[in-house]
Amino acid sequence: MSKKISLKIGILMDSIESINIKKDSSFAILLEAQKRNHIIHYMEMNDLYLRKEQAFARTRLIKLIKNTQKWYQFIKQQSISLSELDVILMRKDPPFNTEFIYSTYILERAEETGVLIINKPKSLRDCNEKIFTSWFPDLITDTLVTRNIFQIRQFWEKYQDIIIKPLDAMGGANIFRIKKNDPNFSVIVENMTNYERKYCMVQNYLPEIKLGDKRILIINGKPIPWCVARIARIGETRANLAAGGEGKIQSLSETDWKIANYLSPTLKKRGLILVGLDVIGDKLTEINVTSPTCICEIESQKNISITGMLLDYIEKKVCL
């Protein structure tokens, strides 16, 4: 692609004011886009709107600075039709709630005018990060999605050591391990299901978590050869970095490659261009499609530009 061509790149994300620029994948992607002289239009959820059949947003042109004190500067605010953009990066973090779903409808209207949306709005709706794993039964451990407390109790009695988690959260939020004879079983399950009014996911505990909960990144169907093995603190079940876990960079194992290569064609077909797989041992546990992280951790230790791979894809796709 000619260096003279500047794309109009929109990004929809949570407040840039509250990010950690040393670890934030969205910030890393935007830095790469800025380095390539693309024009960045920053948006938050409140900025999106639909007027008749047309998608609009109040955007702010933004300049990024790699400075831990002040890392961004808004240059100009304007209301535009999203059809004026070349690409929109949907990087809004969960919760995956009705507001998130509504935003994908608006983005889909922009997509229908020819704007490239990463990841594809319809697939963001269809591919819940927890439930989507059930489309690949050979890759996952025994998994129950229910809001029925009796079914959860039966599952617990069978395995005697289980993990229960919500379907719409991130970063290890509200994940519980329930061991054999845990006196708190009832109160945990009642709260997780909101007294049988809310679905959750239940899985047997995987002891391989002690070796790390691996985050494997895939760009346009191509697995990154290194992953981040997130290891839980002593006394903690959750290995997520957001929950205090320690991240170690390691090469993909043979099993990791098999899982990633098996999933890649489906992800690519669905327009899921930037994806993070979570793997414990040899089991797939989540398929992160909303705003996958761990780009910075890998790039800081390995001679690879994951953000560069993503921007290469965008430039090639838009300029075909």
UniProtKB/Swiss-Prot annotation:
This protein's name: Glutathione synthetase
The record lists Mg(2+) as bound by E286, N288
What gene does the UniProt entry assign to this protein?
A: gshB
According to its UniProt record, this protein's enzyme class is ligase
**Matches recorded under HAMAP family:** GSH_S (MF_00162)
UniProt EC number = 6.3.2.3
Pfam families in UniProt: GSH-S_ATP (PF02955), GSH-S_N (PF02951)
Keyword entries, A-Z: ATP-binding, Glutathione biosynthesis, Ligase, Magnesium, Manganese, Metal-binding, Nucleotide-binding
Instruction: Give the cofactors, semicolon-separated.
Output: Mg(2+); Mn(2+)
Q: Does the keyword ATP-binding apply?
A: yes
